[in-house]
Amino acid sequence: MPKLGIEFDEAAQKQLEVPLGKREIYPSTGKYVAEILREQGVTIAWGVPGGHIWHFVDAISRIGIKLMIFGHEQNTVYAAEAYSQVTQKPAVAFGTVGPGTGNAFSPMQQAYLSNTPIIYLAGGIEQEHDHLYNTIQESICSEFFAHITKWAQRLFYPWSVKQFLTRGFRVAQTAPMGPVAFELGVDCLFMKDEAREHYWGGFFSQHADYVPNWRQEETTSRIKSAAAPEAIEKAAKAIFEAKRPFIILGDYGAWDQATPEIEEFINLTRIPFNTRRLGRAAVSEKHELHHRGFPKFRNEFDMMIPIGLKVGFFDGYAGGWPESVQIAPADEYIWTYVNTKAALVGNTKTVMQQLNECIKRNGYDKVSREREAWAERCKKSMAEATEARTARAYKYGPDHPRYRDNDFLHHGYMSQIIREVNDELYDSAVRVSIDGYTMSDFVMPYLQFTRPASCLTSNDNAGVGHGVGQAIGAAIGDLENGSRIPFLALMGDAGMMNAGMDIHVAVMYKLPIVYLVTNNGGWMPGMKYPWYGPNWDNLGEQDMIETEWMGVKQFGEERPTEMQRFDQMAKVFGGLEGVVCNRSENFREQLKQAYNTAEKSGPVVLDCIVDRHLVNKAVIGPVYTLMYAHLPWEELPLRGKHSRRSVLKRWFPELQKLPEMPIFDSWEPITEKEYGYEPKVDWVR
């Protein structure tokens, strides 16, 4: 056990000639903060220190909690988010007033959208200068965090700190979970506890409204609830009577550690399932009834069973779903746009236990031949889809003319090789952060996971740059749990530009991380081919490729890959290995070697030069087609015209007069005849 600071060591205090408090603040607000974190089982705090918060940051360290110090506050919260998701424990992050809390805003928003329980401890200014904007680093984060946290509270009095923080841990961990922020300003930190003697007639005790270990031995555990018995009976009967049901496992299958119960339910009922985000491998994706995505005959489903799933944008708001049994951790996760036969609300593990017991008690585990036939049909669909995906990926491998003759890779081929290597070396137990936007579309159907909380994303925040911090937080969480299986952060070059310098933290702690960068030279540069032209011709002339502006030739909205060498980060951070991969035939072995290095000695940046022609299929799909609806038809490249003709023909009646123009395949590179005119530089080809 680490040596404690003397303020936490009563035996050592008795040896002092001059009692604590005569020459320093004692007891301090920082002491109270640290004691609550220890009581709640916190072992690590993630942050960037600063003058306004040294009082409590130092105390957190002096009580024996490890400080993980970063260069930028955004990465501290991303790391805390991943750590919490991997360990299923609340995480603590901190940042100073002003720039510190401001930098934490985006990741706090992401944590709110991913329902991650983070306790954020922030600095604050003196109250007497509120809204004058003439003191140093003025901000009131309890105000600007208010709509992206479950609770944001400004604290003024030392004697109220313990009860507020204790409540904060409960609120953060109550479903739907989410971050809580506490602003501990200098008024609170610089105040002596004895001030309460002059407050409200001295009626307040040292720790008002606080009870130590308030739930006794269960203080650090989440409070669990169960579903109504009558709802369980109704749901079990409906599930038994369904002929072609399908399950979607969401995040709370992982959060509630419900793997055994959900797997038993699947085995009892013989219902095929797919998995989403953090819920991927809530039941192993090697289970015989797992189906990646939906089968082609999804219109035949007669019941949908979402378990702990946020049903929203990426699910089409349940459009086309049949009658459903919703299993949710809280009322807020019961969706009113879903045709619902029964709703079961409670801790996922507990509810699934209830449901399994009811199924066995009523003989609902004796499934019909029709259900067995349905299961077999879905198994066959999965096998065929896997075979088709494999064949499609290998089409764009080393034997494809474009990838044989050029020094860059196809995202789809890389996705298949990642799947194969992860399975060969680690039985598909590699955790992965999905960061690069283009790669996210290609790789998601290919990835296979065998342990819960393996697929880390930006959730509905849909940002980039989170993968750097997430990899660090997840790796530390795994090390705490005794695993050194490498973590794979699938970064894009934009995400690396955003957050890459904090890779130094991974280097300092020799963390087993492979930062695989799909480097295509910009913010989705492939979008120019369907929407802007090869030279970014639909932008203003000052932004087109090769135009001179202030004496400098322009690159549109991209940059040549030879100008950004992420492998060269190894020259900045000693202990980091940097590798370039630009040949398909080398990718498999280079990935294996990267894993080997990461596992044995520390992080690797694998800078993969990829085909800039390729786009996430969403770029030529309905939503992006709307986003580009302002561009004049006559100026659109061929692929953009095809997308607009296919998607918006009802909105723009003139489009219906044109011949059918099917949407292009996003896996296919641009052909020479599609350019319409010559690119001004060769690297755009």
Cite the ranges covered by each PLM segment.
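N-terminal alpha/beta PP-like core and its mobile active-site loop of ThDP/TPP-dependent enzymes
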Residues: 2-365, 421, 484, 512-515, ...
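Short glycine-enriched loops at secondary-structure junctions
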Residues: 50-51, 73-75, 136-137, 330, ...
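Thiamine diphosphate
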Residues: 129-137, 259, 298, 343-345, ...
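Active-site flanking residues adjacent to catalytic metal/cofactor-binding acidic residues
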Residues: 182, 307, 327, 434, ...
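Short, well-ordered beta-to-alpha junction loops that form the rim of enzyme active sites
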Residues: 183-187, 250-252, 435-439, 608-611
